[in-house]
A protein has these predicted regions:
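Active-site-adjacent loops and short helices of periplasmic peptidoglycan-processing enzymes
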Residues: 22-197, 204-207
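Intrinsically disordered, low-complexity regions
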Residues: 16-17, 24, 118, 227
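Sec-dependent N-terminal signal peptides of Gram-positive bacterial secreted proteins and lipoproteins
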Residues: 2-21
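Domain-terminus/edge residues, biased toward the C-terminal soluble/receptor-binding domains
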Residues: 1, 173-180, 188-238
């Protein structure tokens, strides 16, 4: 059963962010996943999952990552603002760029004025500051840093606008019919929406890149020769 719930946990681990705009997908700390008996056929298992997990989200999906089989769903197609869960798609495109050889973990990126201007969660990049892809990934995943994520986006596509176009193209390729991205970070923007089902789909694509687990499983790290601490607020990785 650990394999079956892996995607659900990965969705929670990305960037230490567990929320849509107005509702967290939570796992009760007292639940025993081993008590869930999942049929081998396509029999719905919503009842069994619902009795075991304390789910308080407006929408939720539990998907088996290898087959795409949905084990539990609640309003799976409702369009909601994804906040920093947006970074799942951003990270997927960065992983794919690394696989293509367009970037490496040692590639040095110079922060633009635009990247440094991002609000919300950030590592306070200065315009002209340089940082490796590896460090920007750490900042994006562990601290959900919007400036770091934007710097990566610009390195992949030349601009955030160009990167967002790639995000929407990739979403369409994955069949994410309830998703439209307006930025790479998840900062509030009208029409920037996705659904629980689409989050599961893009998460399934992301975790096929084993490199991402080097970042999503980290509790604490640092940047700038130890001068800037990174702490993952997700208690599941502590």
């Amino acid at each position: 059963m650990k394999r079956i719930i892996s995607l659900f946990l990965v969705v929670l681990c990305i960037g230490g962010v567990t929320v849509f705009a107005k509702g967290a997908v939570t796992v009760s700390s007292e639940c025993d996943i081993s008590d869930i008996n999942v049929p081998l056929d396509n029999t719905p298992v919503n009842a069994a999952i619902g009795q075991t997990l304390d789910i308080k989200a407006k929408s939720a999906v539990l998907m088996e990552p290898n087959t795409g089989r949905v084990l539990y769903e609640n309003n799976p197609d409702e369009k909601l603002p994804p906040a920093s869960i947006t970074k799942i798609m951003s990270l997927l495109l960065v992983m794919e760029a690394i696989d293509r050889g367009d970037l490496s973990l040692e590639t040095v990126i110079t922060a633009s004025e635009h990247a440094a201007s991002m609000g919300g969660s950030q590592i306070w990049l200065e315009p002209g500051e340089t940082m490796t892809v590896n460090d920007l990934l750490k900042a994006s995943v562990i601290a959900s840093a919007n400036d770091a994520c934007t710097a990566l986006a610009e390195a992949v596509a030349g601009s955030e606008e160009g990167f967002v176009a790639l995000m929407n193209e990739r979403a369409a390729e994955l069949g994410m019919t309830n998703t439209h991205f307006k930025n790479c970070t998840g900062l509030d923007a009208e029409g920037h929406l996705t659904s629980a089902y689409d989050v599961a789909v893009m998460s399934s694509a992301l975790i096929k890149h084993t490199l991402i687990k080097d970042y999503t499983t980290v509790w604490m790290d640092s940047l700038r020769d130890g001068k800037s601490e990174l702490v993952n607020t997700n208690k599941l990785v502590r």
